[in-house]
């Protein structure tokens, strides 16, 4: 599910184009949520006016220290924010754990700070030889980048764990030397920039897609700073930096102009290594492993920080002095720190390097720094009655879901909330995701309460306060809020937890803000020498190389009987041969009979499929179903209470579903998206509409018990504020429970039932079933599928699947099979930290222990069942405290399901299994996966396995273990090195999902069609299916596979314009695979933006492509010169079709075109120069387009 990007500072909303200050130009670390950062601003204003707040301010300024106790988390944030903001100071909050820091950050974002930054730290030992995870380092750089420039930072809040107080950074002055400030208009040799970028650790490539990369094309340099949200494009005029612009990493298009930016190093190693070299320190004497260094480069130089610098720094060294520091729960911070200190001290001793400077300090020494250098506040939830501490004595509000009469009496002061405590004279605030409903429910019981939509409408809020009217504010964020009473401040706050019993739907976790090229559509047809390709006329061949001949470039394709040269501008007649088999395909002979026979056989099968699909669509169009009314206010309220920002894909899927429900024929829609991409929320909204707007019953069907449990809990939580009843039907229900559920379904007392295939049993009778939601239909058996098929004619059906469905298939079937695709990944998905290691029991023990220490669970995956029980025994010896479960495909289904459910419920810590890990299962606590013998798995398999972790926003780890390096082949070694570089949601991930898409086609279209697809390759099959559907729908212009242009033209991409071969191939692919000629100006703009002004051969290439596109759409297969005077258009079209086209030409031109069988002669055009011939044909073909059916016109020429 995609979380929103909260706009947390003015600089993000109205960005100041003239300021170089990093605060305005670079975005910093944030946990995003669908919230108004000013939600609590009116409560903060109110707190600041109270006498007790004034006393606390004076005490803090006079003594430099305030100690508060008796405070839960939310009032802690409110009180310290009001104090720091009234003193016009920044805020640093130190917590004991990462989880607590995440919660603090989510709450501070509601409290009016200009920026709220989470400063990420590692729980690992500073002496760990592994490299620090990039995401964490970049997150630190984002926070440090602003602080290091010495600008007057105002309105800034930073949250970190006590690890941020440990020495883990280079000195401030040293790091500042490694930061490069760039300004528009400054003189700088672009060559010296290259040297600086290398010094800062930036890697040069052909395209910039992710942090730490840079590329150069002439006078244009692209860089993705690790401390920024977007990459930047620098343009030079001579030695002057003329332009600085952000650009979108997905489209590579330029965006906003900037006046300046600051580049930080990509990691701290870039700062540490030169310091070590300057002192001529030989790292081999300090435990650096030569073999590891040879394979992966120098790793983890942070453990030598003390050798490089006599005084390593911590976060406090970088803070402005105008900062109030808050130590939250000092006892817990101390305990957590001391446990870490003891473990790390043992690691340091085990190194047996007594002269290696220590990078661990005990907590009391760290606390002294806080007390001497800053004003600081300590906070404790436990009531303390000592002289130094002020006990705020906060009280919780008892949870009383749906007891509005009782709550109204309490808020009016007519009933005691605790013995001797009434709230009649208290300032009362209600924070709710359903504010209008909350207000109306309380007003029914004579409670004075008002909803104020704008939390900064201070006059209206103050007026309500004077009139003793409770103020209700809207909130739908991620922070878990609990109501409280502050007797010392005479303030009470009530949340949805007390009103409806509704808990937060998710725990906020740290996510570094950035926009990466995750949405970038990877060019699946990107060809490399050695790839197998399919040519539409000749079949399967092997791509050898790109070759220049005369004025054009050609792809050399190896066939069984020789080499075929394909012009680069005809690249659309080729596609990569993609199939699911592992054996290389046999090469065809050029123009051979075998390929023609295969094509004809597949074409017949595809036509039959198209006819079947269209018949099914026609049948469904005649059925009549229940038409639901438009959305109710409750529907709007439920959707507003969703704590994440829905992605555009999600919103479109919801609109599609609602349109189906409000239509008068039964819905049968498929929603497709990976686990965690938000399919369930689409279903939640549909279910709610069916129950509340249509008074219908709903059944949600899932293939496994574990999934039913997850869906049941989601619905219970989302629908808590509403009078909706939900039942769960699976094999863990007792006979009496099942009997009660069945009776309530029959009588209509139960609105929703969630269950496995039992829901389809003959004993299940509904009073009025309106909607059936099916999760992963392809995983049900034949009998269940038949029952579902009969239900589909009677009720609305919504099917969810996590198997990717390719967009090409989606486009072909749109209008025939209702499908919605959710392809946008959630920004909260943190890239998984991948570790490569030779098999080592100590590495495994540490990885498991680290995960269990933070309350998580572990998948341990092996490639085979043999020896799995023994492995379980070995793990028990390594980690005696761990509870271990074992799961594999040869277990009884019920036993395997019980094991998975127990693991899901946290009854086991480690699941030792084969690759059967549940594809649709979402277990947020599993954040470490260990894969033994990683070299035995394919890349796509490893991606799928790795994708089982990292779902909750917590940093996940994947350990890929391989045998001793001497046993590895060179190929396996290279693959493992490449694996370490892959990012979970980057291009490699998309390539792996494309392999799964082929399975998705099989699931959707059946086994026979899968076989046809294997024969001719996936891409060509999809094209045939689209053509068959169009043909049956009545398009008369003949289809030609390619248009050959035999005119003496100079049309190609010169090597000095796009030097990189891979980029050049991608450029040819992009320009030749356009859907509409409208795309060409945009491509020309993009190329001009990225590579500079278009040279003449490239302009000619654009015209050739436009001509080909128009000619192909009109059914012309070849354009050639005939004699000295004429041009010939070869075509399979019949004369009536030609007459239809010719009618669209002006009268004076019609006589120049002469039709005869299989060709049209254009008289007199041959005497003109080739470029002029092309211009005339483009103009005339454009006129002929008017004869095409309107739908096809829109597809080809653009709407």
UniProtKB/Swiss-Prot annotation:
> Which residues does the UniProt record annotate as the domain Helicase ATP-binding?
660-822
Whether ATP-binding counts among this entry's keywords is: yes
Outline the extent of the Helicase C-terminal domain. Answer: 847-997
SUPFAM superfamilies per the record? CarD-like, P-loop containing nucleoside triphosphate hydrolases, TRCF domain-like
InterPro entries the UniProt entry points to? CarD-like/TRCF_RID (IPR003711), CarD-like/TRCF_RID_sf (IPR036101), DEAD/DEAH_box_helicase_dom (IPR011545), Helicase_ATP-bd (IPR014001), Helicase_C-like (IPR001650), Mfd (IPR004576), P-loop_NTPase (IPR027417), RecG/Mfd (IPR047112)
* EC number assigned by the record: 3.6.4.-
Biological process terms from the Gene Ontology for this record are: regulation of DNA-templated transcription; transcription-coupled nucleotide-excision repair, DNA damage recognition
EC class of the enzyme, as a word: hydrolase
Q: Where is this motif: DEEQ box?
A: 775-778
Q: Does the keyword Transmembrane helix apply?
A: no
Domain of life the protein comes from: Bacteria
* Localization of this protein: Cytoplasm
Residues involved in ATP binding: 673-680
Q: List the keywords (alphabetical).
A: ATP-binding, Cytoplasm, DNA damage, DNA repair, DNA-binding, Helicase, Hydrolase, Nucleotide-binding
**One Gene Ontology CC term in the entry:** cytoplasm
Q: Which GO terms describe its molecular function?
A: ATP binding; damaged DNA binding; DNA binding; DNA translocase activity; helicase activity; hydrolase activity; RNA polymerase core enzyme binding
Q: Which family does it belong to?
A: In the N-terminal section; belongs to the UvrB family.
Sum up the protein's function in the record's words. Couples transcription and DNA repair by recognizing RNA polymerase (RNAP) stalled at DNA lesions. Mediates ATP-dependent release of RNAP and its truncated transcript from the DNA, and recruitment of nucleotide excision repair machinery to the damaged site.
Q: What is this protein called?
A: Transcription-repair-coupling factor
- Gene designation per UniProt: mfd
């Amino acid at each position: 599910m995609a979380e929103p990007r909260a706009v947390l500072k003015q600089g993000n909303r109205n960005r100041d184009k003239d300021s170089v200050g990093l605060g305005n130009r670079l975005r910093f670390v944030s946990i995003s949520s669908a919230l108004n950062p000013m939600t609590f601003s009116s409560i903060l204003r109110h707190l600041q006016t109270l006498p007790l707040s004034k006393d606390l301010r004076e005490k803090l300024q006079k003594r430099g220290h305030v100690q508060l106790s008796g405070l839960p988390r939310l009032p802690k944030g409110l009180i310290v924010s009001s104090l720091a903001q009234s003193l016009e100071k920044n805020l640093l909050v130190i917590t004991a754990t990462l989880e607590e820091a995440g919660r603090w950050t989510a709450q501070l974002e509601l409290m009016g700070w200009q920026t709220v930054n989470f400063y990420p730290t590692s729980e690992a030992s500073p002496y760990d030889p592994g490299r620090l995870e990039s995401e964490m380092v970049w997150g630190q750089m984002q926070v440090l980048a602003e602080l290091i420039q010495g600008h007057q930072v105002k309105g800034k809040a930073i949250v970190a764990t006590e690890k941020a107080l440990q020495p883990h950074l280079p000195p401030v002055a040293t790091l500042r030397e490694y930061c490069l400030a760039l300004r528009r208009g400054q003189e700088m040799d672009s060559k010296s920039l290259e040297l600086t970028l290398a010094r800062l650790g930036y890697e040069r490539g052909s395209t910039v897609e992710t942090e730490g990369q840079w590329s150069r094309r002439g006078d244009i340099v692209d860089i993705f700073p690790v401390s920024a949200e977007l990459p930047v494009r620098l343009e030079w005029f001579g030695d002057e930096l003329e332009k600085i612009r952000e650009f979108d990493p997905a489209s590579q298009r330029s965006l906003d102009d900037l006046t300046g930016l600051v580049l930080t190093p990509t990691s701290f190693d870039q700062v540490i290594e030169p310091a070590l070299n300057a002192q001529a320190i030989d790292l081999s004497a300090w435990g650096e492993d030569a073999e590891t260094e040879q394979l992966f480069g120098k790793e983890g130089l942070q453990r030598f920080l003390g050798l490089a610098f006599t005084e390593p720094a911590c976060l406090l060294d970088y803070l402005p002095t105008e900062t109030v520091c808050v130590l939250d729960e000092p006892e817990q911070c101390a305990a957590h720190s001391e446990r870490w200190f003891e473990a790390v001290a043992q690691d340091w001793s085990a190194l047996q390097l007594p002269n290696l400077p220590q990078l661990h300090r005990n907590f009391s020494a760290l606390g002294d720094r806080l007390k001497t250098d800053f004003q600081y506040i300590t906070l404790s939830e436990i009531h303390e009655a000592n002289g130094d501490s002020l006990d705020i004595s906060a009280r919780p509000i008892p949870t009383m879901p749906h007891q509005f009469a009782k709550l109204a009496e309490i808020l009016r002061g007519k009933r005691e909330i605790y013995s001797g405590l009434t709230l009649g004279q208290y300032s009362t605030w209600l924070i709710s995701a359903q504010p209008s409903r909350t207000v109306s429910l309380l007003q029914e019981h004579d409670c004075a309460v008002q909803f104020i939509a704008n939390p900064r409408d201070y006059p209206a809020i103050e007026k309500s306060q004077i009139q003793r009217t409770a103020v209700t504010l809207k909130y739908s964020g991620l922070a878990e809020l609990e109501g409280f009473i502050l007797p010392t401040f005479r303030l009470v706050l009530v949340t949805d937890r007390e009103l409806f019993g509704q808990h937060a739907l998710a725990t906020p976790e740290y996510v570094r803000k950035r926009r990466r090229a995750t949405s970038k559509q990877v060019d699946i047809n990107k060809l490399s020498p050695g790839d197998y390709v399919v040519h539409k006329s000749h079949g399967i061949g092997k791509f050898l190389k790109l070759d220049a001949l005369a004025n054009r470039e050609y792809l050399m394709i190896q066939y069984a009987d020789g080499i075929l040269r394909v012009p680069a501008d005809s690249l659309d007649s080729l596609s990569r041969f993609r199939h699911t088999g592992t054996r290389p395909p046999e090469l065809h002979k050029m123009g051979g009979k075998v390929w023609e026979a295969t094509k004809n056989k597949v074409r017949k099968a595809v036509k039959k499929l198209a006819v079947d699909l269209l018949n099914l669509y026609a049948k469904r169009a005649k059925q009549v179903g229940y038409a639901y009314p438009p959305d109710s206010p409750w529907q709007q309220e439920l959707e507003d209470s969703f704590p994440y920002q829905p992605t555009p894909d999600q919103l479109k899927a919801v609109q599609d579903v609602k349109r189906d429900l409000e239509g008068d024929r039964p819905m049968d829609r498929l929603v497709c998206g990976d686990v965690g991409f938000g399919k369930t929320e689409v279903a939640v909204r549909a279910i709610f509409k069916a129950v509340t707007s249509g008074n219908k019953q709903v059944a949600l069907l899932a293939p496994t018990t574990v999934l039913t449990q997850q869906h049941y809990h989601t619905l219970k939580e989302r629908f808590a504020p509403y009078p909706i009843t939900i039942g769960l039907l699976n094999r863990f229900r007792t006979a009496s429970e099942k009997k009660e559920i069945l009776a309530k379904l029959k009588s209509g007392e139960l609105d929703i039932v969630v269950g496995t295939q039992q829901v389809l049993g003959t004993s299940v009778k509904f009073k009025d079933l309106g909607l059936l939601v099916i999760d992963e239909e392809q995983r049900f058996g034949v009998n269940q599928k038949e029952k579902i098929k009969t239900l589909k004619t009677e009720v609305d059906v919504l099917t969810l699947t996590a198997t990717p469905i390719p967009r090409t298939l989606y486009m072909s079937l749109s209008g025939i099979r209702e499908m919605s695709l959710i392809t946008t990944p959630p920004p909260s998905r943190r890239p998984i930290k991948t570790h490569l290691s030779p098999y080592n029991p100590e590495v495994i023990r540490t990885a498991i222990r680290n995960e269990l220490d933070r309350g998580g669970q572990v998948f341990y995956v092996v490639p085979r069942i043999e020896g799995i029980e023994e492995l379980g025994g070995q793990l028990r010896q390594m980690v005696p405290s761990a509870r271990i479960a074992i799961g594999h495909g040869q277990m009884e289904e019920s036993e395997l399901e019980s094991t998975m459910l127990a693991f899901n419920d946290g009854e086991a810590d480690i699941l030792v299994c084969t690759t059967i890990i549940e594809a649709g299962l979402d277990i947020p606590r599993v954040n470490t996966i260990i894969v033994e013998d990683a070299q035995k798995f394919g890349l796509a398999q490893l991606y799928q396995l790795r994708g089982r972790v990292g779902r909750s926003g917590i940093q996940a780890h994947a350990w890929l273990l391989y045998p001793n390096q001497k046993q590895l082949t060179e190929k396996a070694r290279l693959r493992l090195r490449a694996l370490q570089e892959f990012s979970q949601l980057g291009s490699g991930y998309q390539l792996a999902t494309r392999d799964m898409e082929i399975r998705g086609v099989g699931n959707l279209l059946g086994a026979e069609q899968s076989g046809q697809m294997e024969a001719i390759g996936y891409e060509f099959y999809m094209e045939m299916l689209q053509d068959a559907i169009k043909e049956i729908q009545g398009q008369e212009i003949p289809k030609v596979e390619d248009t050959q242009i035999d005119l003496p033209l100079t049309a190609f991409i010169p090597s000095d314009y796009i030097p990189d071969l891979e980029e050049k191939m991608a450029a040819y692919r992009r320009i030749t695979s356009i859907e509409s000629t409208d795309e060409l100006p945009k491509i020309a703009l993009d190329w001009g933006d990225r590579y500079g002004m278009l040279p003449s051969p490239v302009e000619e290439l654009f015209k050739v492509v436009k001509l080909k596109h128009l000619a192909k759409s009109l059914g012309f297969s070849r354009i050639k010169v005939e004699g000295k005077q004429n041009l010939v258009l070869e075509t399979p079209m019949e004369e009536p079709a030609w007459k239809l086209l010719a009618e669209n030409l002006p009268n004076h031109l019609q006589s120049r075109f002469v039709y005869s069988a299989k060709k049209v002669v254009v008289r007199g055009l041959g005497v003109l120069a080739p470029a002029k011939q092309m211009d005339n044909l483009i103009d005339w073909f454009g006129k002929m387009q008017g004869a095409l059916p309107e739908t096809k016109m829109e597809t080809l020429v653009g709407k």
